[in-house]
Design a protein with these regions (language model features):
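Glycine-rich, proline-tolerant flexible connector loops at the mouths of alpha/beta enzymes
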Residues: 62-87
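Bacterial Sec-dependent N-terminal signal peptides
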Residues: 1-26
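Metal-dependent catalytic neighborhoods of phosphoester/phosphodiester hydrolases
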Residues: 71-75, 113-116, 261-262
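Histidine-acidic metal/acid-base catalytic patches
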Residues: 3, 23-37, 41-59, 170, ...
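Conserved beta-strand positions in the central sheet of alpha/beta enzyme cores
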Residues: 61, 102, 129, 152, ...
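Active-site acidic/histidine proton-transfer and metal-coordination neighborhood
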Residues: 92, 96-180, 189-190
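Aromatic/hydrophobic pocket-lining residues that form π-stacking "cages" and hydrophobic walls in ligand
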Residues: 48, 89, 116, 140, ...
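Active-site-proximal loop/turn and secondary-structure-junction residues that shape catalytic pockets
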Residues: 39, 64-66, 106-109, 134-136, ...
């Protein structure tokens, strides 16, 4: 390699590193972009964390029922996990330097709700993503205040209970600030709803998001595309959240190309950072 080529190579490396640093520094305050472990449901949590670490992602939302390790059958189900299982999860998170920011989508019986909050507290999880019904809200509100853990109501597509933002908005009136929503923008798109309009209706109650960019609008069986290439208006979503002063977690929930979707997740998060750096 001649001297000119060497200098050009160094310049290219410098520019790439500079862009990466600027993108990180340009992230709005309190924004944590990571992945829903369900994206990698064909793999164990151990493999999921390894995948995320390999692309520099440091936040994960766990879900109930995923195998914890490559070997063994114990899962992340809070109702059956052992002390050894929780210790294993902590060790895996520590090994890959990844923070478990949320857990869900999870519902619990009245009897199991305290166990769910205990599980989250022990693992340092600050958000429980759920579709709990309003008849549990009094108990949930007390637990949120006691544990200082947030409960985020998640929306699946129509006709699920929370498919329309008006429902969650109405049910959360007068409730603790620790209770809010996990806005799944892909399921809004499947339901024929504009994600930006939905976010406006929920301003002040948004705790976290599941981000999907879908190939079709208003179609239940639409599938994921890399962010910025589909119908979910991800850039518009980020601009609206920035306007609201939102601080919280974003989870990539990529439910397509199941066997090899890590490149799509990496491309999506790179797009997120480019948009966020310009806000």
């Amino acid at each position: 390699m001649n001297n000119k080529s060497f200098k050009l190579g160094l310049l290219s490396l410098f520019l790439m590193l500079s862009f990466h640093i600027q993108a990180q520094e340009g992230m709005p305050k309190g924004w944590k972009v990571g992945s829903q472990a369900y994206t990698f449901r064909l793999f164990s949590l151990e493999e999921t964390l390894e995948k995320l670490n390999s692309i520099g992602v440091k936040y994960v939302e766990m879900y109930p029922g995923q195998k914890i390790s490559k070997s063994g059958n114990e899962t992340t189900d809070f109702t059956s996990i052992t002390a050894d299982g929780k210790a294993k999860i902590k060790a895996l998170l520590n090994k890959d330097d990844i923070e478990a920011v949320a857990y869900g989508v999870v519902n619990a019986s009245d009897e199991d709700l305290p166990k769910l909050f205990d599980f989250a507290k022990e693992l340092g999880i600050g958000i429980l993503t759920s579709e709990s019904k309003p008849n549990q809200f009094d108990q949930i509100e007390k637990l949120c205040e006691e544990y200082q853990i947030k409960l985020a109501l998640h929306n699946h597509p129509v006709p699920s209970y929370y498919w329309h933002p008006e429902v969650a908005s109405r049910m959360l009136e007068g409730r603790s600030e620790l209770m809010g929503v996990c806005a799944d923008i892909g399921h809004w798109v499947r339901s024929g709803l504009n994600p930006v309009d939905c976010l406006k209706q929920l301003e002040g109650r948004i705790i976290s998001l599941h981000i999907k960019d879908l190939n079709k609008f208003g179609v239940r069986d639409a599938h994921d595309l890399p962010w910025g290439t589909g119908t979910s208006n991800v850039a518009g979503v980020l601009h609206e959240l920035h306007r609201q002063g939102f601080e919280g977690a974003f989870s990539a929930e990529y439910e397509h190309n199941w066997e090899n979707n890590l490149p799509d997740v990496e491309e999506s998060i790179a797009y997120f950072k480019r948009v966020a750096a310009q806000l």
